[in-house]
């Protein structure tokens, strides 16, 4: 819930309600990410201190101009790393900096994915991503990494669209000398048009399916067998 504009209590209540309807009971304590912000900021400062992060003083106008040039060249936007090696003594006094992680530039990183096998990426394509905004609040990739480490997560399973985030988070793990968890990225559910199914496109919720009489056992089996099968077995139980 680090995104204050989109995080609301009713969303949390609905998630827990939907999981219970599916028959998935969480056996741990309820965890609220925003209560751990001080831990996230502490790690950002450690990364800054050990040379794995830096303060970026680019103005909003500079960033927008970089994005505009990338669009004109039909290239994905990657921050140009302007402040990566500039001494802080040269910093402007009227701009509050963000803190960026100093991503590796040379070589490549290999993700040993439990579903997709070895996935390799050129490190130069991973931007120096923001870990602390200029208002001092942490971003998703920092918060999620710190939380997963502190909660001793051994396996992280999520959608294929998070793969680029995994490469970023792996760099934080390595910079902090933390043990890497095992990662698995699963295919996304798409619409008839081939687009990613999204709540922004008015995709149905579990509550919608419940109201029209879909049984949780049926929906679980349907989701499980999307893109996967086990011999001729069609019915699975928790």
Describe each PLM feature range.
Residues 1-27, 40-49, 59-62, 70, ...:
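N-terminal, positively charged nucleic-acid-binding surface of large information/translation enzymes
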Residues 27-35:
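A short, structured active-site edge motif that brings together acidic residues
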Residues 22-24, 149-152, 196-202, 218-224:
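Short acidic (Asp/Glu) and glycine-rich catalytic loops that position anionic groups and cofactors
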Residues 18, 50, 172-175, 212, ...:
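Generic, well-ordered alpha-helical scaffold segments in large soluble proteins
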Residues 33, 49-185, 190-197, 205, ...:
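Active-site cores that bind ATP or allylic diphosphates and position pyrophosphate for catalysis
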Residues 3-8, 35-37, 162, 190:
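Acidic, metal-coordinating catalytic cores used for nucleic-acid/nucleotide bond scission
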Residues 6, 10-14, 174, 189, ...:
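Glycine/small-residue-rich interface belts in oligomeric ring/scaffold proteins
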């Amino acid at each position: 819930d680090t995104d204050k504009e989109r995080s609301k209590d009713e969303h949390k209540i609905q998630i827990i309600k939907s999981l219970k309807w599916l028959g998935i009971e969480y056996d741990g304590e309820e965890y609220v990410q925003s209560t751990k912000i001080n831990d996230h900021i502490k790690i950002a400062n450690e990364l800054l201190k050990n040379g794995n992060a830096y303060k970026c003083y680019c103005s909003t106008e500079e960033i927008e101009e970089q994005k505009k040039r990338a669009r004109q060249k039909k290239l994905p936007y990657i921050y140009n790393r302007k402040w990566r090696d500039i001494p802080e003594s040269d910093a402007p006094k009227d701009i509050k900096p963000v803190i960026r992680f100093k991503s590796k530039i040379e070589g490549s990183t290999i993700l040993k994915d439990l579903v997709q096998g070895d996935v390799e990426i050129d490190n130069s394509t991973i931007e120096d991503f923001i870990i602390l905004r200029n208002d001092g609040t942490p971003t998703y990739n920092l918060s999620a990494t710190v939380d997963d480490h502190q909660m001793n997560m051994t396996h992280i399973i999520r959608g294929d669209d998070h793969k680029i985030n995994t490469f970023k988070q792996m760099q934080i793990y390595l910079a902090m000398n933390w043990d890497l968890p095992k990662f698995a990225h699963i295919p996304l559910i798409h619409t008839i048009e081939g687009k990613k199914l999204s709540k922004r496109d008015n995709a149905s919720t579990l509550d919608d399916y419940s109201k029209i009489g879909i049984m949780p056992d049926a929906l679980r089996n349907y989701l499980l067998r999307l893109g996967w099968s086990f011999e001729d077995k069609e019915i699975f139980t928790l």
